[in-house]
C-alpha cells in the first residue's frame, strides 16, 4: 500500500489511472496473490482505488485525502529519523544544525 501511496503523492499515479491487476502486481512484487488481494481491498476501503468489474482497478483519490496521506507519510519518516538520531546521541539542536548545513550545501549544489 505504501508503494501506491508514494506513487500517488509523487504524481506517478493519477485519478483514473489503471493499476496492475492483483495477479500482475503479485508477480511484479513477487508476493503471494492473497497478500495483494488484501492490500487492494484495503485501498478500496480507504477510497484510494475503485475496482470496476471486468475493467480493472483504478486510482480514485481526492486531493484532500492525498494531502493528508502526504502529511502522514512525512510525519512517519520524520519520527523515524528523529528516533534514530536520538539513539545515536544527537540532540534537537544538533539535528537543526545538520539540516541547515545539508540544505545550504544542496542550494549551493543546485546553483
Each model region followed by its residue ranges:
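Extreme N-terminal segment that seeds HTH/winged-HTH DNA-binding domains in transcriptional regulators
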Residues: 1-18, 24, 72, 76, ...
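Beta-hairpin "wing" of winged helix-turn-helix
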Residues: 12-13, 17, 45-54, 58-61
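A short alpha-helical element within helix-turn-helix/winged-helix DNA-binding domains
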Residues: 18-29, 43
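Short, cationic-aromatic polyanion-contact patches
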Residues: 21, 55-72
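Residue cluster at the C-terminal edge of the helix-turn-helix DNA-binding motif
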Residues: 28, 45-48, 88, 105
Amino acid at each position: 500500500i505504501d508503494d501506491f501511496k508514494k506513487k500517488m503523492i509523487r504524481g506517478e499515479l493519477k485519478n483514473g489511472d489503471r493499476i496492475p491487476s492483483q495477479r500482475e502486481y503479485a508477480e511484479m512484487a513477487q508476493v503471494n496473490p492473497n497478500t495483494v488481494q488484501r492490500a487492494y481491498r484495503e485501498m478500496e476501503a480507504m477510497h484510494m482505488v475503485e475496482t470496476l468489474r471486468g475493467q480493472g482497478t483504478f486510482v480514485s483519490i481526492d486531493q484532500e485525502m492525498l494531502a493528508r496521506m502526504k502529511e502522514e507519510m512525512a510525519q512517519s519518516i520524520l519520527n523515524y529519523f528523529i528516533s534514530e538520531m536520538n539513539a545515536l546521541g544527537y540532540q534537537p539542536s544538533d539535528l537543526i544544525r545538520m539540516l541547515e548545513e545539508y540544505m545550504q550545501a544542496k542550494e549551493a549544489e543546485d546553483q
